[in-house]
Amino acid sequence: MHQQKRQPELVEGNLPVFVFPTELIFYADDQSTHKQVLTLYNPYEFALKFKVLCTTPNKYVVVDAAGAVKPQCCMDIVIRHRDVRSCHYGVIDKFRLQVSEQSQRKALGRKEVVATLLPSAKEQQKEEEEKRIKEHLTESLFFEQSFQPENRTVSSGPSLLTVFLAVVCITALMLPTLGDVESLVPLYLHLSVNQKLVAAYILGLITMAIFRT
């Protein structure tokens, strides 16, 4: 005897609701945008009842504000803005879609969609462009400030190794030359002319490097 497979009981308010888009933008100067379409998707194995609520229902007309969506199907919900006035520019309204099983009254899930009326699409594009330029300038200043400490570190002066080599070369040039019998310096510290030329050459390179830093 086969037992009937029972569907697990769903917790109220935890069912994900799939709606697109999640934001509606109406433009006062473009009548084609005064009508928007919300698409409600039902990816589940059971039918869903839905209801559309609004924070300001007097400003909108919702076609099919309540209904049902078959399993693994979708449904378009048409929303019209009927109060296009300048006093509503920039005001954010909200729609809430509540879904439930056809056999139950409790809401299994909900999804909110924001709606905004703007004066013009061109003004919106201009504001977005100005915002993008401002963000770009801010980023440029950020990177410039980030690199300043590195520049100061590089130009902090000659390294200890450079100073040490310069001192060695100067000391070598001050030592007596081979054949200088009147010097009190031990003979093993006497340098040849070629050795002093090498020391002078290295000292010149070090001096140029110090001036460049």
UniProtKB/Swiss-Prot annotation:
Q: Where is the MSP domain?
A: 16-143
Could you tell me the keywords of this UniProt record? Endoplasmic reticulum, Golgi apparatus, Membrane, Transmembrane, Transmembrane helix
A Pfam family per the record: Motile_Sperm
Kindly state one GO CC term assigned in the UniProt record. Answer: endoplasmic reticulum membrane
- Which PROSITE patterns does the record match to this protein? MSP
The record's listing under SUPFAM superfamilies reads: PapD-like
Q: Name one GO biological process term.
A: negative regulation of transcription by RNA polymerase II
Residue stretches spanning the membrane = 159-179, 191-211
Q: Where is this motif: Nuclear export signal?
A: 205-208
Q: Where in the cell is it found?
A: Endoplasmic reticulum membrane; Golgi apparatus membrane
The question of whether Membrane is a record keyword is answered with yes
The membrane topology of this protein is: Multi-pass membrane protein
Under the heading InterPro entries, the entry gives:
Ig-like_fold (IPR013783), MOSPD1/3 (IPR039283), MSP_dom (IPR000535), PapD-like_sf (IPR008962)
Q: What does this protein do?
A: Plays a role in differentiation and/or proliferation of mesenchymal stem cells. Proposed to be involved in epithelial-to-mesenchymal transition (EMT). However, another study suggests that it is not required for EMT or stem cell self-renewal and acts during later stages of differentiation.
Q: What is this protein called?
A: Motile sperm domain-containing protein 1
Species this protein is from: Bos taurus
